[in-house]
Amino acid sequence: WFYVEKSALNWDYTGLTNYYGTWYYVENSILNWNFTGLTDYYGTKYYVENGVLNWNYTGLALLGSDEWYYAENGAVKNDYTGLTYFCGRWFYVEKSALNWNYTGLTNYYGTWYYVENGELNWNFTGLTDYYGTKYYVENGVLNWDYTGLALLGSDEWYYAENGAVKNDY
């Protein structure tokens, strides 16, 4: 399969092309059945699987060799910020891009989770600071029922009530 433009092969073209309602990934004018990942087409990133645009795909997808984005229904959703599940792990996405630098809390369907370096950390138990308030996290989940002493870092103890440190103690 070759990409023809104005009755001639265009060896320089790499991108998507529509053929009878199906979108295919073409690389240097040749259909690339081995390509799986994201491609940019007129400013929108689309998910291609085995050379064909997959409109049913939702999840993380790779652009190039090191950029991960959140795609929904085959296209990158630029306004999404939150968690996404991929290959058995949960990752933090900010404005559709996986953010390896984020450490803090994030709300996902009403539950607050602790993210460390872009990945949900199920092993974390202790206090974390979120917008000036310290919250108690247990096994990666904010525990609103916790009341008692809690450790921040390696040597700072605070009293938490209902999952948050009260500054008036």
Where are these regions (language model features)?
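Extracellular adhesion/carbohydrate-binding repeat motifs centered on closely spaced tryptophans
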Residues: 1-169
